[in-house]
């Protein structure tokens, strides 16, 4: 498997955590070494929003600069809206940002590395490939 892996905010939180999550840290480190990690604006916003200090914010932004960037295009918003509608009809509730992230992973044919169970729910009904 050599495709890009979009790492959700939940995965990055584990990676940047000072304690625990050794397995996911190892996986993300390997993906970074293989130049297979992707980021997108909504994830960057969530990461920077969660920074506790100015230094931490700048460190996150600097760290993300060397990673593959997946832009959000106009059509992605429309596809995310359709996905949100279809998810709701199946009884699955997801935030607007997470619905957009799932849409981007599907549109760019990336695997999505995450620690949020609702992405697994989405992948059961839609072609979202979750990184295992």
Question: Predicted segment positions?
Answer:
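Active-site neighborhoods of divalent-metal-dependent phosphate/nucleic-acid chemistry enzymes
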Residues: 68-113
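A general structural signal for well-ordered alpha-helical segments in protein cores
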Residues: 24-25, 44, 57-60, 77-80, ...
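Short loop->beta-strand "edge-of-pocket" segments that line small-molecule binding or catalytic clefts
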Residues: 5, 36-38, 66-71, 111
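Short, well-structured N-terminal submotif of metal-dependent ribonuclease cores
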Residues: 1-39, 49-62
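A generic structural signal for short hydrophobic patches within well-formed alpha-helices
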Residues: 12-13, 44-47, 119
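Acidic, PIN/NYN-like endoribonuclease modules and their adjacent C-terminal/linker elements
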Residues: 2-4, 102, 106-132
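Histidine- and aromatic-rich ligand-binding microenvironments
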Residues: 7-8, 40, 93-95, 116, ...
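Structured helix-beta-strand junction loops
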Residues: 33-35, 63-67, 90, 108, ...
